Structures are given as structure tokens and as C-alpha cells.
């Protein structure tokens, strides 16, 4: 009997805050899951079981270990959310993507800006809540940011098949923001706040962005799904089956890794186990390695 592609592991909550200069980043892990590598990377060959990326916490029993969540970012004057997980009470073909406990370390009305790195189902779910009659913005004081290329693609006919496969998450998690007048379409290099800006990184999706923080001489980068799994550090040319434009995603990922490697920049990948941030270092044998923050 073939093993299931997805295995739910456990739910999560807010993790230990990380300081980047005067900015505090709190990862929020909504849940862990294990996924068949071939679902993400259909052309993937056998993995070296002794390689760092094939061992816990990145892999278990032949499965990739992946988290879903978000990041609360507190600057001296702002409280932002980078991505919004999968949400609660939303009908999805994959039962893992529903009924996920809400564990934000701040009150919903404290968040003034929600930045979407892209509009995939696992990055927008908590953007809205059901008020008994309709889906409404979940963070009442917030503006929500996306790019024109991103919004146009996911609301257009070209993405219809993807929406059908994963449930109409655009209808319950994105369009209500637009209807409420709180969804702002910004440039892919938009300055979000002092020391916080977007950087274009197309490929995984057409309007995909990364989020850069610079504070008191320190730098961090929210990679979204540019690095979905540690495998892509060892093999940067490897794109997932969920990338809209695989070659473009590879080019953006390679540029990102060149930019942050060996610089001390703290990387916040969206789906690494326990949302542990780290630094990217060049591997003399090829590709890159990941040093979780605190490892040195």
C-alpha cells in the first residue's frame, strides 16, 4: 500500500523571539507536517541518508518535515505580520489545512500591517475570519499588502486549476480583503516601514517577494517559499512542483542565496521545522548549509 503524501504531526504555537537590532521577530508555528519528497520534488533522485539535509529536523523516516505558520514583527513603531498561515474553519480538500489553532503572541488589533510574500493557500488563511455571515478581515487595524502581478494571477483564469485543487482560498481569504478596502497593491520593492522593505523574487509565484529588515547594523530576510526545504540550500537549482515558473524560481533563489550567504544575514524560511531562523554559509563541497541562530 502506498504511504500517504501528507502526514499531520502536531500543532504549534509562538516560538522564542529573535532580535534583529531594535526589531523583534516571533515565529508562530501553526502546525507541523511530514510530506513525501516526491510530492514537492517529483524528479528528485535518492537522497544521501547521511547528508545534513536528510536528517532530523529536516527529514524523518524518509519524509520531509515542514511547518506552516507566520512571523510577528515588532519594530520600535510598528507591529507587522509576515504571511498568515492556513486559517480556521475553511473548507479545504486537504484536511491538514483547516482547524488550526490560532496562537498569535499579540492581540489581533495590535497588528497594523500584514505582508503577503505570495498568495498561496498556506500564507493567507488567517487573513480573514467568519463573523457569522461573511468572511471579514481578521486583523481589524491592518492594511494587507500584495503586488499587482500576484493579485492579478491568483484572481485570473490561469490559476483556476490550482484554486480548484486546494479549495477556493482566494474567495474566502483574499477577495474579502479587497471588498473591505484594506488590500493594498504595492510595488515589489515597496518600503513597508522604516528598515522594512520588499524585494522582488518572482518565480515561485508571479509576484512573489521577500521581506528585508535592516536595524542597527543587523539584517534579516524573510524568504517565504524561495527556500521551501533545506534540500534547496544544498541544491539551489531544485524548484518545487508548486512553483508557477520553475526556472524563474531557481534564478530568484540562487540570487537570494548569493546575497545572504556568509554575510551574517538571518534568514527566516517560511517552512523550516520549528520556524528556526538561521544563517546561510557556503558549503565547500557545493551548495550551501544552514546554521540555525544560536549555533555559533
Language-model features: where?
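Active-site metal-binding loops of divalent metal-dependent hydrolases
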Residues: 30-31, 84-87, 119, 149-150, ...
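Short, P/G- and charge-enriched loop/turn segments at secondary-structure junctions
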Residues: 56-61, 132-133, 198
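Conserved beta-strand hairpin/beta-sheet module of binuclear metal-dependent hydrolase folds
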Residues: 14-103, 210-224, 229
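Cap/insert and terminal regions of metallo-dependent hydrolase folds
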Residues: 217-296
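Residue-level marker for buried hydrophobic side chains located in beta-strands
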Residues: 80-82, 115, 144, 220-222, ...
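Metal-dependent catalytic neighborhoods of phosphoester/phosphodiester hydrolases
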Residues: 96-99, 125-134, 279-280
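Metallo-beta-lactamase
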Residues: 3, 95, 102-106, 110-124, ...
Amino acid at each position: 500500500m502506498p504511504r500517504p503524501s501528507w502526514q499531520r504531526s502536531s500543532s504549534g504555537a509562538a516560538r522564542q523571539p529573535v532580535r534583529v537590532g531594535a526589531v523583534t521577530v516571533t515565529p508562530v508555528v501553526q502546525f507541523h507536517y511530514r510530506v513525501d519528497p516526491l510530492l514537492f520534488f517529483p524528479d528528485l533522485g535518492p537522497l544521501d541518508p547521511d547528508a545534513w539535509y536528510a536528517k532530523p529536523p529536516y527529514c524523518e523516516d524518509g519524509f520531509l518535515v515542514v511547518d506552516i505558520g507566520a512571523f510577528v514583527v515588532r519594530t520600535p513603531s510598528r507591529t507587522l505580520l509576515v504571511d498568515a498561515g492556513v486559517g480556521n474553519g475553511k473548507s479545504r480538500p486537504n484536511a491538514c489545512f483547516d482547524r488550526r489553532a490560532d496562537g498569535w503572541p499579540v492581540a489581533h488589533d495590535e497588528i497594523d500591517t500584514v505582508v503577503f510574500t505570495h498568495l498561496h493557500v498556506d500564507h493567507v488563511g488567517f487573513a480573514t475570519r467568519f463573523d457569522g455571515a461573511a468572511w471579514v478581515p481578521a486583523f481589524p487595524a491592518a492594511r494587507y499588502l500584495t503586488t499587482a502581478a500576484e493579485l492579478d494571477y491568483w484572481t485570473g483564469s490561469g490559476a483556476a486549476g490550482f484554486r480548484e485543487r486546494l479549495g477556493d482560498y482566494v474567495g474566502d481569504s483574499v477577495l474579502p480583503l479587497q471588498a473591505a478596502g484594506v488590500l493594498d497593491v504595492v510595488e515589489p520593492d515597496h518600503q513597508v516601514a522604516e528598515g522594512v522593505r520588499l524585494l522582488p523574487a518572482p518565480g515561485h509565484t508571479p509576484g512573489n517577494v521577500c521581506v528585508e529588515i535592516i536595524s542597527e547594523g543587523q539584517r534579516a530576510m524573510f524568504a517565504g517559499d524561495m527556500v521551501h526545504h533545506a534540500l534547496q540550500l544544498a541544491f539551489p537549482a531544485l524548484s518545487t512542483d508548486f512553483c508557477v515558473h520553475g526556472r524563474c524560481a531557481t534564478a530568484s533563489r540562487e540570487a537570494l542565496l548569493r546575497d545572504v550567504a556568509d554575510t551574517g544575514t538571518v534568514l527566516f524560511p517560511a517552512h523550516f521545522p520549528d520556524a528556526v531562523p538561521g544563517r546561510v554559509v557556503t558549503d565547500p563541497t557545493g551548495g550551501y548549509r544552514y546554521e540555525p541562530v544560536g549555533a555559533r
